[in-house]
Amino acid sequence: MDAFMEHAPDQAEDLEREYLKFNAEHLPDMVTEFEGIPQLLADLVEAGANLGVVTAKRRSVAHDTFAPANLPDDLAIAAAMEDTPVHKPNPEPILLGMKTIGADPASSVYVGDAIYDLQAAAAAGIDGVGVTWGAGVPEQVHAQPNAGIADTVDELRSILFN
């Protein structure tokens, strides 16, 4: 809603309604499983990792995103758009997410596909790992300071398990 208010305050409510309607109708066609991610998540949990999702999406939209992506049903949405008044690159969503799942910032890593994810991780004082698939612009992800960049799921696995 903030973006709509900023760019078209007189139409913000209508634009948000249309945006949510579009997501509800098209999300299953727009989101697909990234091969290897469900297994990587399972392996991380088996290794003792405490996992959670911090997203700029509304909680309901984030839940709807999981179904076509074949992500585990019990993967916690630790922080969603409505949970904080500010959003990435501000660190508040990541800090809230870590608190929600009981994660230790000293050993936490945030994986994201956009420059704002890596900026928020840095501002939260944790390592950020960029992936070049997803919604972000790979060149921007590569240009942002980070703890690693993964162009494939195997590269991400290597970074996270080292």
Regions found by a protein language model. Name each.
Residues 1-47, 60-63:
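N-terminal helical cap/lid subdomain that shapes the substrate entry/recognition surface
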Residues 42-45, 49, 58-59, 63-162:
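Asp-based, Mg2+/Mn2+-dependent phosphohydrolase catalytic module
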